[in-house]
Amino acid sequence: MRLFCLTLLFCFVSMLYGDVMYEMVSTSEGMMGMKGETNMRIFVKGDRSLTEMTAENPMGGTMTDTKIIRLDKGVIWSIDHDNKEYTEMNIATPTQMPEEPDEEISIPDVKVMRTGETKKLLNKDCEKVIVTMDVDDDEGAMTFKQTMWVTKDIPGYKEIQDFQEHMTGTGSMSSSMMGANKKTYEEFQKKISEIEGFPLEIEMEMTMGAEGMSFSMMTHSEVTQIETKPINDKVFEIPAGYSFKK
């Protein structure tokens, strides 16, 4: 389970970007060649974000998900539009950080390489950055490679940086997901912070699991639109008439 959480965390960190609206299309291929497509629309304003996601896959059909992150309130709301309900998860702040575990957990081997290669995406000059990560523990091994094309030449880049810094300030949530102590998480985050710029295209390859029981996954994600625009504060509120689901 820790390997899976670590993968989610790493992908999440690499996509933490801010005060703009952007749309992204992701395609994935996993076990037995099964493919899927996910469309995302993300709004971010200061310390608030809304993510709308629609996923299509052969096994599960169409799935939708809406999440609101309110760093000012320290919560994440998951919105169920079909039933007009929402759930709430608290985000731990640095002052609420859990005690460090007795067992020291080793940091994964993370490498970041700026290649110097460039290409144009959305008429912006982007640089190729490759991130690799290797994890080996009781649950088995995991290898992770992520190729990103990043640029600073996008609308609202300063706001993007500010949001990322604010989000990483809630690192205790991610740290507990990893099962890592505070020092370990800080070292991990320091390595990730070497990646500058906003990724307009990402390719990810991952192999995870014990020997003889491993599976592989590949995804390709591309930003199709990005812009700065006035965003109404109501976008980041629970819709009127929705009830809390315990």
Question: What label would you give each PLM region?
Answer:
Residues 3-13:
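Sec-dependent N-terminal signal peptides
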Residues 17-246:
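Extended soluble regions of mature proteins
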